[in-house]
């Protein structure tokens, strides 16, 4: 397996048959680190067998795919610029178009506690889908284009354009539980909920991350904070990079961030410190995913056209075995 290591050491390798264009999302199967789902601007969704380093299957959309999610080990859901939400049976390799949005679908997540698929779109709505039928189970207006969303137990945290954050209760979508403004000054790039369900992490295009808490009480809100990251001093000038990706370690509640500087950092939010930084990757980190057991981190290094169409390294997915020393609060 380590023949693919190329400069990365024995705890990391590169996946074969990577997508042919930008990588939009990497997601591990809910109960194993064996399978990884990857969506891409090449209009494909790919399923990889990670330990074997092989692509198991690939299915197509009519346009670039912006996000994907596992519903269960044998069903993938995905959406993108073709506005269509697809469910794909990974056993039979069969497609179902479940429904659509009026604009590109930016986010696809599964909520196990309520058993719904959630999609967020640039059409300024969130839609819920019943995966059993499968069919639409409701459409809910948001204040602006949906850029990111994350499921926390039975709650849904939505980040939109205009730096807005909304907290919804997936069991009762009749009204918004909380309306917030991002505590960061610049556009929201990614929101991910803490596995312990107490809060979320929000990253922006301007090299910053905020750690936020859901409980609105003053006592709890005092604990929130933000910090700078993914900034590099070059010739005495500070270069500031977008923080594109956040992924939580399910057991430790620590999290990884990936930026357009090509670095991945792991943070301890409780002691407010960085636990480690990996080597620099060849280009921007577009997406990150810890496996459910926290043993493995998938890292998508994929140019995000921050500087328009310049020559850039080919898109790649690195699979890294992580240790407690790198991920456990100290």
Curated annotation (Swiss-Prot):
Any GO molecular function: ubiquitin binding
Keyword Cell division: yes
Stretches forming WD repeats: 8-49, 52-89, 91-130, 133-169, 220-268
Keyword presence, Cytoplasm: no
Bilayer-spanning residue ranges: none
GO cellular component terms, semicolon-separated: bub1-bub3 complex; kinetochore; mitotic checkpoint complex; nucleoplasm
Keywords carried by this UniProt record: Cell cycle, Cell division, Centromere, Chromosome, Chromosome partition, Kinetochore, Meiosis, Mitosis, Nucleus, Repeat, WD repeat
SUPFAM superfamilies associated with the record: WD40 repeat-like
Swiss-Prot/TrEMBL GO biological process terms: cell division; chromosome segregation; meiotic cell cycle; mitotic spindle assembly checkpoint signaling
Pfam families: WD40
PROSITE patterns listed in its UniProt record: WD_REPEATS_2 (PS50082), WD_REPEATS_REGION (PS50294)
Source domain of life: Eukaryota
Entry function: Has a dual function in spindle-assembly checkpoint signaling and in promoting the establishment of correct kinetochore-microtubule (K-MT) attachments. Plays a role in the kinetochore-mediated mitotic checkpoint, which delays anaphase onset until all chromosomes have attached properly to the mitotic spindle. Required to establish and maintain spindle checkpoint arrest in eggs.
Subunit structure: Found in complex with bub1 or bub1b (phosphorylated). Component of a complex along with bub1b, mad2 and cdc20 located at the kinetochore. Interacts with znf207/BuGZ.
UniProt family annotation: Belongs to the WD repeat BUB3 family.
Name of this protein: Mitotic checkpoint protein BUB3
Naturally occurring in which organism (per UniProt): Xenopus laevis (African clawed frog)
